């Protein structure tokens, strides 16, 4: 194994939140010896509608643990709204580049907030609410991020399924989490071809998934697809018809945020449930120490 060491550039080191191995070890030691103080401090990077009354409770015999009990927050609000309210609405929030580099889209925080609120209201109009599970079966397009944020805004639990998986793979994951709706796209792109049958796969899947009531379809390629009246809805039409404002739902720290399934390569896929407060705190902490996206400290370094 190579023992080569590649030090960071002086510019990167100057902007780092951990400037030495000794500082990293100090952080690690504190996380082990004072976990409550460590994580309470890092949780303050988030916006909380209500503070927690108990940092953590656990019972290792029952394999039960809870963090930030009593605290209320919202993932979408933390990722989008607070940056708008802090005066950064015109800053870039999302950059998307398609299969063809000439195809790209950029969203500011304010633009993303507007898109997400309409999408959230579109979901609510279709009967989706807090605690309902939504399967998101799309490629890496802007609407994927918007759909995730829209679900978290209203308290729905999203479950992302890889966009190249088959109808059978969809069935397994949808039935396990009893998804109420699917968000997908007409067809998927691979190279110069537009023939990944994503909507067709969703149509096949719903024949064996009794919990699904609605399919929301993004018009990605413009390919002709079958739309079932009363069940299938075009994404753009639903969002255009939706109200412009949708307040973020305050969620308990231990409320489910999303379900991510294991690959299933060694057996039936297992759904891993991530809860709101703990996931956001860890993600914000990791981002703060690892993702140097700016050349100088930024108020958005925890999003």
Language-model features, listed with the residues they occupy:
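Conserved small/polar residues in nucleotide/adenosyl-binding loops
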Residues: 262, 294-301
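ANL superfamily adenylate-forming
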Residues: 101, 184-253, 283
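Conserved structural elements of the adenylate-forming
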Residues: 116-117, 272-292
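N-lobe entry segment of adenylate-forming
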Residues: 1-107, 111-114, 118, 124, ...
